[in-house]
Amino acid sequence: MDENSTLSPAHSDAAASSSANTPPLPYVPSALAPFAGLWRGEGEGAYPTIDDFAYTEEIEFAPTGKPFLAYRSRTREAGSGRPLHSESGFLRLVGEDEAELLVAQPTGFTEIHRGQVREGTIELSMVVLSASPDAKPVHSIRRQLSVRGGDLTYDLWMAHDLTPLTHHLHGHLRRD
C-alpha cells in the first residue's frame, strides 16, 4: 500500500480477518476513502421550471483496486417508488488532494468535474458537459459532496436553457 492509499472503511474489518487464501480487498486512495461504500437516504429537488419534489436515493462508491471509485446513483419518487433519475461513472484522484468526477446519464449527458478534496468535502466545478443531439438544453452543472461521520450530503446546481446556475438538488444519505 502506498502512502496515499488505505482500505475503504467498509472493508477494513473484513481485511483484518481474511485468510492467506483470500485475495486482498481493493485499496482506495486515502482522500477518497470516506466516500467509499453504499449510501441510502432522501433528497429534495426544486427548479424554476418544475414543481418541487422529494425522492429516495441509493449511491454507491465502489472500490475498484485502482485509484478511483466506481460511482452509481439511483433515485425513486418518494411515496410511489417510481424510478426517477440514474447516473453512473467514476470518482478518481488526479492529484494528492484533487478529485475528478466523471458521470454518464441516460438522458444523453456526460459530465467531467474537478475539485479539491478538503476534510471530507469535494467542491466540483464542471470541466466538460457533452450532450447528445436529443438531450435537454443543460448548459452547466456544479456539484458538492461531503462526508461527515456516517452521513453523505450533496448539492447540485444547474443552468438550463435560459435559467442561470440555480440550486436544484440536495441529498442526505447514511452509510448502509
Curated annotation (Swiss-Prot):
InterPro entries: Calycin, Nb(III)_bact/plant, Nitrobindin, THAP4-like_heme-bd. Keywords: Heme, Iron, Isomerase, Metal-binding. One of its GO terms (molecular function) is metal ion binding. The keyword Iron applies. It catalyses: peroxynitrite = nitrate. Residues 1-23 are annotated as: Disordered. Belongs to the nitrobindin family. Homodimer. This is Peroxynitrite isomerase 1. The lineage of its organism: Bacteria, Bacillati, Actinomycetota, Actinomycetes, Mycobacteriales.
